[in-house]
Amino acid sequence: MIYLVTGQQKLFENPNYKTISIEESLQLMKDCKALQYDSETSCKNFHLGNILCIQFGNKAKDFQIVIDCTTINILLYKDILETKLLIGHNLKFDISWLYNYGIIPRKVYDTMIVEQLLYMGFPRIPVYPDRYEKYNYDFPYKIVQSDKKGTYYELSFSLQALAQKYLDINIDKTVRGEIIWRGLDTSVVLYAAGDVTFLEDIMWKQVKACKEKECLVGAKLECDFVPVIAYLEWCGIKLDEKQWRAKMDKDKEALNKSLQALNNYAIKHPKLQKWVKQDLQGNLFSGYDTESKWTVDWQKKESIKVVKALGFNVSTISKQTNKESESIMEKVLSSQKGIDDTFLKLYFDYQGCYKICSSFGQGHLNIINPKTGRIHTTYWQIGTVTGRMSSGGTTDEDLAKFKKLPINDCKNLNFQQLPHDAVTRGCFVSEPNNLFVSCDYAAMEARAGAEVYNEKVLLDEFLYGSGDTHAAYAKVVFTEELKDVAVKDIKKIRPDLRNKVKSVEFEINKIFI
């Protein structure tokens, strides 16, 4: 049975649902241990919009309750939201909105997160329907129509995909994009109720699958983390704008110096004269400027021709197409020592400065939320195929509209890859009368990996040494460079090699994970 709680007066009863009072709705949910939960909002940014309605469902009592939050105080349901087990899909989103009201859910089960755990490591590759049937695949999918590839299935963790997989039910999401202008009409009420009808059934199917794969404890741990990561997004972090602008000015100065040094080297290089221009003719108005000019933009494709002219091999295999292509990225050129090491140093210095200016500049100021004065990015608790957390990668369209900026100028930032220097990190500050508390699990993956592999070098480092696994890996990989440096001193003496070896370390640990 579908119920609606609203402060709006209805002239006629609706045959599709029954309007009840706040007290009646609370009484219905009073004895429920678990409730299916969802919410509809005016936008995606929880600091710029409003909750339009919240929905509860319970299978045993066979009800779905839709509460009109435009006319009903959501705090009347605070006790329900904080004491019951909430079963939802992508609950991080819904919980973030509740924090605006001081409502802090304690117990949650997230069907999306559990499904991601069950299919951790499964690739997002096109699978055609005939192959899906032939090889008895069971992963949840969305149907993709492509002019080049035809119709194929792609891994998806949407509620529609899970309902189709576990219950063979098609959930229509057409109404979702119309809620803001439609209001709580009959279609919206039925749609909202539908989102809290099948979550419990999906949960029990997943619990069975978790038992079979022996990952039930992991599923609980992931679900317990959902309110935490929601709080992390909701809180955000304060950026000292004055310090950041000063950093940007210094970064631009460093970029200009590195570009000038690179261009000057290229201008004087005998193999690169075809890209050097001199104005020997001049004119009556601007006069003469016989100084040599470099004509290639190092960020454009033409720069590949320049690097090839110096004798470097720029061939590589594209990850996107799996075909041979050309690239002058550092990972392609760094191994080609002895061809023109001076150029490589100047070029890598320039690219490093360019990366700093383009990735850690105005974009951080654009994404500051004017309502909170903080940066709120997006975090994905199972953001990689190995289960590691990731952040950023999306665009905050609501914030862009609010600040009247182009949509692409408000990109959520990757806060897991900030430069290590004190100047950059010093721009992120605590509020007045508050302090930062920083803590970290020391080499968690490496410790687990060392035990699984019974790797004596790492075990000895943990038990009797400095415990610095990054340095221990660096010692093994860069034998010549670090032959006279103790593991405990590598972080201080050669932090560059210690940082560079992390990719090797994480790749090895990924195998056992």
Identify the meaning behind each predicted range:
Residues 103-106, 416-420, 426-430, 451-454, ...:
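Short, surface-exposed loop/turn microsegments at beta-strand edges and helix-strand junctions
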Residues 106-107, 123-126, 256, 313-318, ...:
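Cytochrome P450 catalytic domain signature, combining two hallmark sequence patches
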Residues 426-449, 462-506:
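Conserved catalytic alpha/beta cores of large enzymes that bind or transform nucleotide phosphates
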Residues 50-53, 102-105, 123-126, 393-411, ...:
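Short secondary-structure boundary/capping segments
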Residues 511-512:
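Hydrophobic helix-and-loop "lid/oligomerization" segment in the mid-to-C-terminal part
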Residues 80-86, 292, 433-437:
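Short active-site oxyanion
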Residues 1-48, 63, 133-154, 181-423, ...:
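Conserved "right-hand" nucleotidyltransferase catalytic core of DNA-directed polymerases
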Residues 2-17, 45, 49-210, 221, ...:
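Active-site-proximal helix-loop-helix substrate-binding element of RNase H-like nuclease domains
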